[in-house]
Amino acid sequence: MTPLSHIRNFSIVAHIDHGKSTLADRLIQSTNTVADRDMKEQMLDSMDIERERGITIKAQTVRINYTAQNGEEYVLNLIDTPGHVDFAYEVSRSMRAVEGSLLVVDSTQGVEAQTLANVYHAIDADHEIVPVLNKIDLPASDCDRVAEQIEDVIGIDASGAIQVSAKTGQGIMETLESIVQNLPAPKGDRDAPLKAMLVDSWYDSYLGVIVLVRIMDGVLKKGDRIRMLSNNSTHNVDRIGVFRPEMTAIDELGPGEIGFLTASIKQVRDTRVGDTITHEKKGTEVALPGFKPSQPVVFCGLFPVDSSEFEELRDSIEKLALNDASFSYEMETSAALGFGFRCGFLGLLHLEVIRDRIEREYDIELITTAPSVIYHVYMKDGAMIELHNPADMPDLTLVDHLEEPRIKATILVPDDYLGDVLKLCQDRRGIQQDLTYAGSRAMVVYDLPLNEVVFDFYDRLKSVTKGYASFDYAMIGYRTDNLVKMSILVNDEPVDALSIMVHRERAEGRGRAMVEKLKDLIPRHMFKIPIQAAIGGKVIARETLSAMRKDVTAKCYGGDATRKRKLLDKQKAGKKKMRQFGKVDIPQEAFISALKMDG
């Protein structure tokens, strides 16, 4: 049993690509936690997609034994948190499970928007923060400038910042020593009733759900009956252990320690991140503060390209949901796309990760409909409906008003591109809240509708700033606006997968852009096809895709004009009939391209 004074719990805060996982690898390697022959890049990122995209999605943990310079043995528990904005709730929970953070900043690039967001999570959790300047082996490294920036932008003292190169291993020992010297030891009472925070959970096909816990008070032993405070479910603990990084069984976990338990739990949905775990008898009734069930923010439809793969898609979605409590799904049918699922996600990265995993791990080709957000529709009879799919919009004559979700977006951008960024935010109905400068970079804060950000805002931001801007957002609530549902009709048939909610003032421009794109993307048929954008019954934009023409008069030589006329009239009647009964095939890329906004 390690005394509390010799435990240090910490996390690493960094923007994507600033070297967080590499630093974690070096800390593990230099303390011989993992033998050199077992070492691999991004040791803690277990999903292939985490390694491939170079991001951390689930919180991972490792226990490191370190002998300090004063000769004493310390136990260091590292929780490697996700850095991306979609997983902000996971970050805030992981932060509450530890007492300190290493703030890793790339000394060639400086502070980025996600660094800021995660540092604020750390400050909210009352962390002691140790700044670490990484990548000092690169010629473009400028530690003084970046240290100054940390002080200006974040407001913490960076005079004692540790300079490291996670790649070469320089400065790693100083980092370990600094963790022991500067970060506080955890507090906790061994004799109090058990109070443990559920930091993360994932599904294992042999053990059921594995739960990552941080013990606040009391002791957790193998064989204990435990209870979750959020839903009062009880379970029997059949295994307890720690990660070194592989799972290692131990007998008990005491205050301040971070480890895992298994209790034959069948579904990840029963173990909610941030929940409080206690003993069934003589447990605590006071939950740890800050728990909230995760709510999906972005919705979209997932349909198999080949409709015979629907059952495989259902299996894959059910398996992914086992491991991801923030992912929700329900069955949906679409006239254009057949059977599929309407899924809810935390944000766009979360959507992409799930879609990539289905395509890669289960080999199913998918059609993704336009992402949409949750609108609040207030009816004239006083009822309020949550609208997840624009195709389900009730009749406008019954609707009193609509509210849409707004976000507070923080964008860090070099001065040279500021004008383009302001124009982009203005174009997306943004309201400027703040503009400050730190050195040669500007920090802009905008109030934006989530609907305008959800599809391709991030791509557009990256392209107008040549990839230099960084972006982070937080939800701020709902506001009324003049929104309407725009439908797209192809050959007079509405295509439900292309329905979108737009601001009334922008509907015409957006509709015109979409029908022009569809005209280029839909292949020509034997009959002419009108493509229209409509609000209610009013058509606001139209393009006509002309028919392919067969020369029916080719075999008439000279002679009588009435013969040609007769053949042409017959062709005309045939085309009219075809148009009435013909089915228009819309290719998959037409769905995605039509929804991408240019400009």
Curated annotation (Swiss-Prot):
Protein name as catalogued: Elongation factor 4
Residues that coordinate or bind GTP: D17, H18, G19, K20, S21, T22, N134, K135, I136, D137
SUPFAM superfamilies associated with the record: EF-G C-terminal domain-like, P-loop containing nucleoside triphosphate hydrolases
GO cellular component: plasma membrane
Enzyme type, top EC level: hydrolase
Compartment(s) where it occurs, according to its Swiss-Prot or TrEMBL record: Cell inner membrane
One function term, GO molecular function aspect: GTPase activity
Membrane topology qualifier: Peripheral membrane protein
Pfam families, A to Z: EFG_C, GTP_EFTU, GTP_EFTU_D2, LepA_C
EC id: 3.6.5.n1
Entry-linked PROSITE patterns: G_TR_1 (PS00301), G_TR_2 (PS51722)
